[in-house]
Design a protein with these regions (language model features):
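DPxDG-like acidic metal-binding loop motif
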Residues: 1-30
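Short, structured interface segments
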Residues: 28, 34-37
Length: 139
């Protein structure tokens, strides 16, 4: 949900696992009513990342490719993934998840909010954010 060009709430449901991820601006991120927090890892080689197929080929990170950006971001918020990056993705694919990451204590970078539909996004915990961004400078 957007209000005044700001994402104020978001919901992602995984019917396979019966998991409901929800975030509200300034009120936190939740999974089935349990508060979420991003990973506390700070050694990038110990981290697990998600991206699209181009990201998997580009990066030397430990990677998973799920094919669902919204759920990938929910997993970053839950600490299941340590980071997520994707280029040229639609805002509606990442709006809810980006709020979830932020409300779970993570950082979302390169989110060119609502200037056009295709955006670039990088999301992670504060502990690895700078290292991740440096690795992805040419992505």
């Amino acid at each position: 949900l957007q209000s005044n060009k700001e994402i104020v709430s978001g919901l992602i449901f995984d019917p396979i696992k019966d998991e409901m991820f929800f975030a509200e601006k300034n009120k936190g991120s939740y999974l089935n009513n349990q508060r979420l927090r991003v990973s506390k890892k700070n050694v990038i080689d110990d981290c697990l990342f998600s991206s699209n197929h181009n990201g998997v080929r580009f990066s030397n990170f430990n990677m998973r490719y799920t094919g669902c950006a919204a759920l990938d971001l929910a997993y970053v918020a839950a600490g299941r993934f340590d980071g997520f990056f994707h280029n040229d993705i639609n805002i509606w694919d990442v709006a809810a998840g980006s709020l979830m990451v932020q409300e779970a204590g993570g950082l979302v970078n390169d989110l060119n909010k609502f200037n056009n539909n295709a955006i670039n996004i990088r999301a992670s915990s504060d502990g690895i954010n700078d290292k991740m961004l440096k690795e992805l400078e040419n992505f």
